[in-house]
Amino acid sequence: MEITVKKFVVGPLSTNTYLVHNESGDCIVFDPSLGCGAVLDEIDKSKLVPQAIVLTHGHFDHILGIDEILGKYAQIPVYIHPDEKIMLENPMYNGSIMMESPFTYEGTTCDLVEGKMRIGSFDTDVIVVPGHSPGGSAVKIDKYLFCGDILFAGSVGRSDLFGGDGQRLIDGIREKILVLPQNTVVCSGHGGRTTIGREIKENPYF
């Protein structure tokens, strides 16, 4: 089943929030940051049916919009890796302690588990790559890889924050991400798209 991917650049750190929908009109919201009004407008305009919020990791700029989405679609589950849950609950760990209003989310979550997962009506492959954060996860749907801050065009995620480990991040990307088909479209948490093939050839970290 073909999917459509729409990117919204939102929040204080220009985070990429992704709206992914299939031909049936079901959709997933990846990494909602602050100011998701345009995402909600698109869901309404296209008559989409939200299935889940999926969080690649728990840093504040990737979670600030959870309440905004759930304010309209309270019934949908929130997925995150278990090792990231402490970041949802602790503004020191998620980085929002430096904001005027530190953010926490203490609602129910569902676990992202490495391997094949059915999320709503979507068949996904979850790839766990710690190093930017304790349980950072990339989620592959069709040819698209939603990887948060694990891998960027020409770079990798920083590793100087809570749970960071630069070598573990590099090793994980090399062993789990760069082995994907080279036409895989990498949808990162910031910046533009790239492909696995391009990163193999051009990323100075590999």
Stretches found by the model and what they are:
Residues 1-4, 96-99, 120:
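Short Pro/Gly-enriched beta-strand edge/turn motifs at strand-loop
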Residues 2-46, 138-148:
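Conserved beta-strand hairpin/beta-sheet module of binuclear metal-dependent hydrolase folds
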Residues 6, 54, 125:
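Conserved Rossmann-like nucleotide-binding pocket used by diverse enzymes
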Residues 8-9, 107-109, 128-130:
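Short Gly/Pro-enriched turn/cap motifs at secondary-structure boundaries
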Residues 29-30, 51-58, 78-81, 128-131, ...:
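Active-site neighborhood of phospho(di)ester-bond hydrolases with catalytic His/Asp-centered motifs
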Residues 34-117, 205:
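Active-site HxH/HxHxD metal-binding segment of metal-dependent hydrolases
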Residues 93-97, 123-206:
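Metallo-beta-lactamase
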